[in-house]
């Protein structure tokens, strides 16, 4: 057995944070009543057949809708997972990067937004869903490189601001 030290870990350095690649981006659906959850399985299978998301090797679909608060329907790719989940009671498309991506942290953040928005656009084309692009969640899923603390936020915020400013020019 290994002793677990529960003391507060020191904040990650900005240099380490900039190596983080496990980026999560989620955009929410405007009206979840426009689709039944079980429809995502067939939709995601068609994406696999067409390899519909650029720069992603789409592999499998897993349906976890029977789990309350679970990940919903998951499209597994080598590089990342896409899932239609109802986290916090809100249906949305979540992109969870698993593999490192090229470029600096800002490039990886842009890549996460781009991949998630490509998935949203594809779902809008394949269904009656519409996504709210003015409301999203961004997370870094790496407790070592990006602990959830004010220092991490301060290091990430300028990169996130750059991405958001390019996506939404002339907005505050």
State the predicted function of each range.
Residues 3-6, 13-45:
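Short, extreme N-terminal leader segments that mark the start of a protein/domain
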Residues 20-25, 131-150:
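Short glycine-rich, basic-tinged beta-strand/loop micro-motifs
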Residues 28-84:
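N-terminal low-complexity, intrinsically disordered segments
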Residues 32-42, 103-107, 147-153:
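Short, conserved charged micro-motifs
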Residues 39-43, 47, 101-126:
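Ampiphathic alpha-helical segments that act as solvent-exposed interaction surfaces
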Residues 53-67, 122-141, 168-172:
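Short glycine-rich, low-complexity/disordered patches
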Residues 78-107:
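Intrinsically disordered, low-complexity regulatory segments enriched in Ser/Thr/Pro
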Residues 144-170:
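Short, hydrophobic/π-rich interface segment
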């Amino acid at each position: 057995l290994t002793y677990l030290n529960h003391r507060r870990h020191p904040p990650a350095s900005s240099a380490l944070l900039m190596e983080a690649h496990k980026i999560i981006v989620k955009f929410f659906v405007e009206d979840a009543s426009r689709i039944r959850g079980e429809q995502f399985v067939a939709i995601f299978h068609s994406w696999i057949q067409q390899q519909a998301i650029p720069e992603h090797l789409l592999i499998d679909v897993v349906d976890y809708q029977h789990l309350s608060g679970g990940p919903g329907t998951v499209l597994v790719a080598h590089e990342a997972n896409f899932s239609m989940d109802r986290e916090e009671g809100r249906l949305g498309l979540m992109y969870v990067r698993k593999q490192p991506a090229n470029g600096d942290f800002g490039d990886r953040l842009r890549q996460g937004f781009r991949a998630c928005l490509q998935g949203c656009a594809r779902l809008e084309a394949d269904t009656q869903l519409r996504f709210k692009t003015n409301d999203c969640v961004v997370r870094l899923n790496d407790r070592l490189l990006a602990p959830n603390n004010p220092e991490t936020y301060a290091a990430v915020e300028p990169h996130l601001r750059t991405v958001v400013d390019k996506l939404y020019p002339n907005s505050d």
